[in-house]
Amino acid sequence: MSELSVNHLLGIKYLKERDIELIFETADQFKEVINRPIKKVPSLRDITIANLFFENSTRTKLSFELAEKRLSADVINFSAAQSSVKKGETLIDTVNNILSMKVDMVVMRHPNPGAGVFLSKHVNASIINAGDGAHEHPTQALLDTYSIREKLGSVKGKNVVIVGDILHSRVALSNIYALQLQGAKVMVCGPKTLLPKYIKDLGVKVETNLKKALEWCDVANMLRVQNERMDISYFPSTREYTQQFGVNKELLNSLDKEIVIMHPGPINRGVEITSDVADSKQAIILNQVENGVAIRMAVIYLLASKIKQ
């Protein structure tokens, strides 16, 4: 059987194109499984996985837990709010204490960029990065590009624009890496204050006019404004942001083609996207959620296969 070139999923930038192809091929099989009446397979009955979330999460945490249980793994859920981390325990000590209970794999979300990379060098377990600060969110990028492949047949050659708060978004960076690795052309669009200075170094197009960006693209991935990561104001008001960078039905109808609308969630309805767009046939937002389980099953299964060797 083919195997991944990595022992951890720390970020898209560590993957090869063949790794993504293998994850997608495996996800295709698991998507068929999760649509059966009996949605469980016994693949990981001998694997224990700990979910360590040091930041709040709903969809990602539930998606990982469901993926793990669909594979029949034993699952431990860890909440930083009720842990010894609050008493000053270090990340390495926390994880090593958990691993001493014979845990094989750690899924971690952490506010500090690079936390997963740091951990992978100090503990003896497979690490999956479920989001590290404003750095990367690899499984989100995988499920996003998998959803594009499912909808349009291929990612290669497609024009994809990522709209919104690029500066604070781990989703944006991972998507840029994943899209480029699969041969897509990438543009970012948002207020200049929410575009990082290094963005052009990533080989992407930059546009501050939303209408022009949408006319160029095949797919628009709409990001929310991450107010929780902002210590200053980056635009005059939410109303003004919506007027310039919010997608509504009127704007989509003014285009000379039909584009695909995506959103990683949570959606701020009426801000970056209106309800009639979010709930329209052009939007594949719920497909992304469904595909997230299959993608995470694939990642966990492929990494666990390397543990078993």
Cite the ranges covered by each PLM segment.
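A short helix->loop->beta-strand "cap" motif at the edges of active sites that frequently abuts
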Residues: A125, G183-K185, S254-V260
